[in-house]
Structure formats: C-alpha cells, structure tokens
C-alpha cells in the first residue's frame, strides 16, 4: 500500500525571506520584460532605456533594473551618476532601498531606476564571483521599494550567463526582447539568446533590430551600413515576433551625453521607431493577457 509521506519540518528548507519578498513584489508588477542580447555592442541598454522612457511617455508606471552587475550603465543613460541611495528599515530588521526616480521635467510618468552604477564610482570595477552577483541581483529585485508598476524592465548583460538564470528562476517573465544588429555575427548569437528564452518558457519573445540603417543627413538616402533585413529574417526563422527596426541616429550621442533617452530628445527617426515599438509591445502583451484596458 502506498501512502503520502509526511511533510518534513527541517530547518533551512523553507523559502528564505529574500526569495519571499521577491515573490510578493512581483505580484505588483503587471508586466515583467527582459531585454537581452546574444553579444555585446548591439545597443541593448540603449533599447532598454528608450523602451522604458517610451512606455513612461505613454503614461505607464515603469521601473528599470540594471542586471548587468559588472558593466552597469543604465543609471548614467538616465542622467543619474554615483549617488546616495537611501533605505527604509522594516519591523523584521531588513532594509529596502528607495530607487531614484526621473521624469525629465514632467515629460514622462516618474521612472524608478536601480543600478549598481549608482553605488560605485564610474572608474571602479566590480570584481565579483557568480555567487555574489546572484545575491546582488536578488537584492535588487527583493530589497528595493519598487511598489506598483505597469512594467518592470530588466536590462540583462550580454550573453546567456548566470545573471539571466537568476532572474528567470526568481520571477515569472512575461516577455523577452532580444536585441540584434543586421550583422551576421550578431545574428548568430541572437539566435542562441532566443532559444534560451524558449527553453525558459517565456510566454512572449520578440526581436528588435538596432542600428538598422542610417539616414544620410545631407541627401536623405537610407544607408544599410551593417547589412539589411537580418533581424526580421532571424525572427521569422525562430518563429518569434519582429517588433521593428531602430535606425542609427546622429542625435543619439548628443542625447546620451546629456543623460536623456533619444525618445525624449526631439522628433528624430530613432525616437519615432522606439515609440512605435513600445506601442506594438503593449498591444501584443494586452492581447496575450486578454487585457483590453487602456492606460
């Protein structure tokens, strides 16, 4: 005869408090979106920052977590340098950090930003082993006062390493946006990132092609510097959505130096592309979740 085994009450086998806090917090985040790339140098963080700003410009409450512990630059791209981070102490003795917010003089709904780049000097490297990186990411998820969010954007480091596994095992992602450029070497690694998200059973996966083309400032002709159509072909091959192309924008460097997302820096081709991509993403996620409500 087979009987049900009794429940064991062994100290240390329960859910640790940090994991429990993460689970409680993610209930308040309507959509959790990862932004990743198979390789570096494709403008992944630029996409994450501008997607965040575009959603906030549409009136949504958005938070962005920089999960690139060794190369954090999200804060700088939002105009936030090394700064004091304040925290609140709770009754059980744990502390939660208060994330800085930016609204660019009221242009957007206040964006909550958290990055290791705020906590260490710009020229100081973070030399941590995997276990410390894992703990840091979990703390940025669970020990920050994120509050209610329509969108939680998580900017992953390039590749398919531990940081991604930590996040995917900690929260249930709603979408993964994989960033590529038209170059063959980028497309090869992008395919690996797409397949990783498939194995992680992320419900919605899409590709964005960054640095897709350049509009000549003199003649207005379109120049395909890195090739043409690679991102769209990859998305079709992998059976995932293609959200759009973002052109090389000469004003992007100027905006970046000022700590302003290009989507908030005038009516430029890249700004238009990011707004269109954000609208497509919102509509797709509402369709998947059966939520037709407007913000």
Curated annotation (Swiss-Prot):
ATP binds at residues 38-45. SUPFAM superfamilies: P-loop containing nucleoside triphosphate hydrolases (SSF52540). InterPro entries: Mrp-like_CS, Mrp/NBP35_ATP-bd, NUBPL-like, P-loop_NTPase, YlxH/NBP35. Pfam families: ParA (PF10609). One of its GO terms (biological process) is iron-sulfur cluster assembly. One of its GO terms (molecular function) is metal ion binding. Keywords: ATP-binding, Hydrolase, Iron, Iron-sulfur, Metal-binding, Nucleotide-binding. Binds and transfers iron-sulfur (Fe-S) clusters to target apoproteins. Can hydrolyze ATP. HAMAP family: Mrp_NBP35 (MF_02040). Belongs to the Mrp/NBP35 ATP-binding proteins family. Homodimer. This is Iron-sulfur cluster carrier protein. It comes from Pyrococcus furiosus (strain ATCC 43587 / DSM 3638 / JCM 8422 / Vc1).
């Amino acid at each position: 005869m087979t009987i049900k085994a009794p429940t064991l009450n062994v100290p240390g086998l329960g859910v640790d408090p940090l994991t429990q806090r993460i689970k409680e917090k993610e209930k308040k985040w309507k959509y959790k979106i990862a932004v990743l790339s198979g390789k570096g140098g494709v403008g992944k963080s630029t996409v994450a920052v501008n997607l965040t700003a575009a959603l906030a410009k549409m009136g949504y409450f958005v938070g962005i977590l920089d999960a690139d512990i060794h190369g954090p630059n999200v804060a700088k791209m939002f105009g936030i340098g090394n700064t004091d981070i304040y925290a609140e102490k709770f009754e059980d003795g744990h502390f939660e950090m208060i994330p800085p917010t930016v609204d660019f003089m009221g242009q957007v709904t206040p964006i909550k930003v958290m990055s290791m780049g705020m906590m260490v000097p710009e020229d100081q490297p973070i030399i941590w082993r995997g276990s410390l990186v894992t703990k840091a990411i979990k703390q940025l998820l669970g020990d920050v006062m994120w509050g209610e969010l329509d969108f939680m954007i998580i900017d992953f480091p390039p590749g398919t390493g531990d940081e991604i596994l930590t996040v995917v095992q900690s929260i249930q992602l709603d979408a993964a946006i994989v960033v590529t450029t038209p170059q063959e070497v980028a497309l090869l690694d992008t395919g690996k990132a797409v397949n990783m998200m498939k194995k992680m059973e992320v419900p919605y996966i899409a590709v964005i092609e960054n640095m897709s083309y350049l509009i000549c400032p003199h003649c207005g002709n379109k120049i395909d510097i890195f090739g043409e159509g690679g991102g769209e072909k990859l998305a079709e091959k992998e059976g995932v959505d293609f959200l759009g192309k973002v052109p090389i924008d000469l004003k992007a460097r100027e905006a970046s130096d000022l700590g302003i997302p290009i989507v908030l820096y005038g009516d430029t081709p890249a700004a238009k592309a990011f707004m269109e991509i954000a609208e497509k993403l919102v509509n797709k996620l509402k369709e998947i979740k059966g939520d037709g409500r407007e913000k």
